[in-house]
Amino acid sequence: MVDTWFLDSIEVVRGPASVLYGRSSPGGIVALTSRKPSFDPGGEIKLFAGNNNQRGAMFDVTGPVDDNDRVAVRLSGMTRYADSQFDPLKEERYALMPSLTWRITDNTRLDLMAYLHRDPEGGSHSGLPYDGTVVPHSGKKISNTFFEGEDDYDKYDRRENMVGYNIEHLFDSGWSVRQKLRYLHTKVELNQVYAAGWLNDTELNRGYSGSDEKMNAITLDNQVDGSFDTGAVNHRVLIGMDYQDRTNNVTGYYGGFPPIDAFHPVYGAKPDYITQYSREKHKLRQTGYYLQDQMSIDRWRLTLGGRYDQVSVSNVDNFNHTRSDLDKNNFSSRAALLYLFDNGVAPYVSYSTAFTPTSFAD
């Protein structure tokens, strides 16, 4: 998850998009494009404040570092803090994104980037019963500032580090080759004491859940694209091969806590018990090969595309000594036809398929 301050654009691709993006939801995807260095010097600083003691700062600075406009850098950062409606819970974030662009030659460009992100506090991740909030319980309503947890046991800490590069070379013929690589490491710790229904007229039952999660992921995308003509038809062709490897380690806990008076809470309780119930490792590998041809014939635009994926999923629970595996191959396709009118109207028809392998094998 990249904070929107570091994004140059957000594009919503509606419908199946597996041909170009690989495994994805049939409903579509959200494509995020981060800010890149500019050879035009610039910068900005923003300060903000709001209710719930909200405050923060953002900055962004970019420009060339040499006289020949071969190398440019960019540094963006932000910090944010806010109280929540529940007294002990806060929201806090720190993030930094350095990036560099190097014009190695007139036809070759290298982009380097890193993203460092931490949320040491994440606000509330719980909820309260309908009976007592929306409607009264035993003639009373719970205060909207009531906190059902325990400050010593409720914790949210998220860290995310990402590095990557894009390299592109443009040939004199107009064809180009590019490679994109990203490595991501994420660590999340979430511990929570939560309400579990009414015990009596004033007290709520409580439970405990906790998880420690780490993820390492690498994605690599290689592309070749260019254009050529066959008679009256202009072709814009994209050929690619991508690869991703993702490993997710999750340890889960559950437990019990003494009940709490929802109308006159007293804090400082200790857990009745906390027990580990899982220690899982989920691994996904995917390799995809894709081809797309965008054809222009006078006012007509015809797009045809296809993609072949090989996916391997394994799930190991080292606590319960279980394992499941899944190997799957799939072909995804896309076809679209559009006509351009002089007034700008462009009716079209499109058909596409999506490939969404489950992360958990049965």
Name each model-derived stretch.
Residues 5-8, 19-96, 104-108, 161:
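Outer-membrane beta-barrel translocator/receptor signature
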Residues 28, 41-43, 55-59, 94-98, ...:
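Hydrophobic, lipid-facing positions within transmembrane beta-strands of outer-membrane proteins
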Residues 37-42, 66-71, 107, 172-174, ...:
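Short loop/turn motifs that connect adjacent beta-strands in outer-membrane beta-barrel proteins
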Residues 43-45, 71-75, 110-112, 177-181, ...:
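Transmembrane beta-strands of outer-membrane beta-barrel proteins
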Residues 47-53, 79-83, 94, 116-120, ...:
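Transmembrane beta-strands of outer-membrane beta-barrel pores
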Residues 56, 82-88, 119-125, 135, ...:
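Outer-membrane beta-barrel proteins
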Residues 80-84, 96-103, 107-170, 183-215, ...:
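Acidic/polar loop-and-plug regions of large Gram-negative outer-membrane beta-barrel proteins
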Residues 101-105, 215, 234-238, 242-244, ...:
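Structural signature of Gram-negative outer-membrane beta-barrels, strongest in the C-terminal barrel
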